[in-house]
Amino acid sequence: MLRLFYFSAVIASVILNFVGIIMNLFITVVNCKTWVKSHRISSSDRILFSLGITRFLMLGLFLVNTIYFVSSNMERSVYLSAFFVLCFMFLDSSSLWFVTLLNILYCVKITNFQHSVFLLLKRSISPKIPRLLLAFVLISAFTTCLYITLSQASPFPELVTTRNNTSFNISEGILSLVVSLVLSSSLQFIINVTSASLLIHSLRRHIQKMQKNATGFWNPQMEAHVGAMKLMVYFLILYIPYSVATLVQYLPFYAGMDMGTKSICLIFATLYSPGHSVLIIITHPKLKTTAKKILCFKK
């Protein structure tokens, strides 16, 4: 029964990854066409373009790895497995940093705080987006290299199982995993929660202001607040279980877990990227309009 449940989880994971690949290809193509036509691109669309490419490569790599694992007639190469893991870690970290930057941009641009730091960020963040994207790629590369370095020095063993159920030890330390992932993920989590909290606080202040002035609640600023807040909150709902599931999958004792636990981790780890990509499309006016045209849902 558990084997059937795990097999169903693998099938669902593959389907979700196909959906994610299509969604991120759509995001990338739409923003690329806009960039080519107008010879300019907004800061948020530049981040979405980078995010779409990164997630497309990451989900494609996951599918290649899954197909290789299922269909290969040879024993699984330890070095090829390590290559898949390292590439996935780099792309995953980059995509999470891009989402974090997107949330920061929404928070800074939409909130109406008059603090000098916010006013400075409002003026200066957009021109710095390309350099920030590059900086986050370098941070992701650094954390991946840190993982490699620590894994070589760590004494903790890990079991890797081949297709013929032969197990052997490789030096893949739990310490290296925890340090490299926590360094990146904890900071991302703090920034995203802070951005969402500031946006909610700004929305509450805006509502109170509208109540005092006896004006209508729903206006362009309110719509921007609510749209960005929904995207951030849904992102956190998807991101928290995803982070836990991904961390568990990388741990040495994951191979010895029961099929039920593996199935749950697989579903949570797979649901985040496609789910968040769909949310981006339905909350982004241009992407939503283009998607409706493609699906023939014109009003």
Swiss-Prot record:
Entry keywords, A to Z: Cell membrane, Cell projection, Cilium, G-protein coupled receptor, Glycoprotein, Membrane, Receptor, Sensory transduction, Taste, Transducer, Transmembrane, Transmembrane helix
Glycosylation sites: 164-165, 169
Pfam family, one: TAS2R
Membrane topology note: Multi-pass membrane protein
Subcellular location: Membrane; Cell projection, Cilium membrane
Species annotation: Gorilla gorilla gorilla
Entry-linked SUPFAM superfamilies: Family A G protein-coupled receptor-like (SSF81321)
Other observations noted: Several bitter taste receptors are expressed in a single taste receptor cell.
One GO term (biological process): detection of chemical stimulus involved in sensory perception of bitter taste
Main location, first listed in the record: membrane
Role description: Gustducin-coupled receptor implicated in the perception of bitter compounds in the oral cavity and the gastrointestinal tract. Signals through PLCB2 and the calcium-regulated cation channel TRPM5. In airway epithelial cells, binding of denatonium increases the intracellular calcium ion concentration and stimulates ciliary beat frequency.
Name of the protein: Taste receptor type 2 member 4
TM region positions: 10-30, 47-67, 82-102, 132-152, 173-193, 231-251, 263-283
One GO cellular component term: ciliary membrane
Family listed: Belongs to the G-protein coupled receptor T2R family.
GO function terms (MF aspect): bitter taste receptor activity; G protein-coupled receptor activity
Extracellular side: 1-9, 68-81, 153-172, 252-262
Chain ranges on the Cytoplasmic side, renumbered to this chain: 31-46, 103-131, 194-230, 284-299
InterPro entries noted in UniProt: TAS2R (IPR007960), TAS2R4 (IPR030055)
